[in-house]
Amino acid sequence: MKYVTLLLQVGVLYVFSLVGTWIQGVFHLSMPGSLIGMLILFLLLSTRVLPLKWFELGAEKLIVFLPLFLIPSTTGLMEYGSFLFSKESIIFLLVVASTVVTLIVSGYISQLLITTKK
């Protein structure tokens, strides 16, 4: 039963992403659809239209894999190495700094969420 609940919760989170992508496509927004879906989910959770317990188990399992979601964006930059170094290395430094800040902030928020739950 636990696995079914986990699959349903992750599936519903994915549906929010799909709805956001659909809204982005219909209205031709420059904001990513997955971000729109997260904003919709945030609004529904913060107004208590949807209870947090409906997503808690699935979100906990996804947070465990959060660092793995950051790896493709970082390794994808290797394709543009010549471009990054051609602009007097300022772009390279900005990319490295933003990656480090993203890792630190996401790690801090993950730890904060884990400790506040306990």
Curated annotation (Swiss-Prot):
Coiled coil: none
A Pfam family reported for this protein in Swiss-Prot or TrEMBL: LrgA
Highest rank taxon of the organism: Bacteria
Membrane topology: Multi-pass membrane protein
Alphabetic keyword roster: Cell membrane, Cytolysis, Membrane, Transmembrane, Transmembrane helix
GO biological process: cytolysis; killing of cells of another organism; programmed cell death
Localization terms from the record: Cell membrane
Entry's Gene Ontology cellular component terms: plasma membrane
Ranges that cross the membrane: 4-26, 33-52, 62-84, 91-113
Family according to the record: Belongs to the CidA/LrgA family. CidA subfamily.
Matches recorded under PANTHER family: HOLIN-LIKE PROTEIN CIDA-RELATED, INTEGRAL MEMBRANE PROTEIN YXZK-RELATED
Task of the protein: Increases the activity of extracellular murein hydrolases possibly by mediating their export via hole formation. Inhibited by the antiholin-like proteins LrgAB. In an unstressed cell, the LrgAB products probably inhibit the function of the CidA protein. When a cell is stressed by the addition of antibiotics or by other factors in the environment, CidA possibly oligomerizes within the bacterial cell membrane, creating lesions that disrupt the proton motive force, which in turn results in loss of cell viability.
Name recorded for this polypeptide: Holin-like protein CidA 2
Species of provenance: Bacillus cereus (strain ATCC 14579 / DSM 31 / CCUG 7414 / JCM 2152 / NBRC 15305 / NCIMB 9373 / NCTC 2599 / NRRL B-3711)
